[in-house]
Amino acid sequence: MTLKLGVNIDHVATLRNARKEAFPDPLDAAAICLAAGADFIVVHLRKDQRHIELKDVAQLCKWFPKKIHVECAATDFAQKAVLKYKPHSVCIVPEVPGEVTTTGGLKFTPAVEKRIFAMIEKLHKKHILVSLFVDPVPADLSAAARL
């Protein structure tokens, strides 16, 4: 297996949004990172779109096909977005309203597993690679493996 470099550009969008301007542009940041040798670009699409926005995901996937990795929750909002814009890969992560950053892995319950399984099936039908953000504990690893 070859090690690959992914660069997260979320905070380029955070700065843009704080300025209430069109710059810095995450699309420009992605181009610079890829030109400098990054293998792929990572963005976290949250429901509140506090940094990366739907328009960013759309543009990134359009201009850099096969180079975009989206982190998102197993929500209708995120699922519709990734099925529409078709990034190369998706990591399903937990999302807690008001959290500053993701602090732990998915919490597996039967309902969560069912929802994630359904999302994985839909993503695979669009040839989108899927990973899960899990805590390194046996029960969570087993749950992820079942999916």
Where are these regions (language model features)?
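Conserved anion-binding
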Residues: 77-79, 84-147
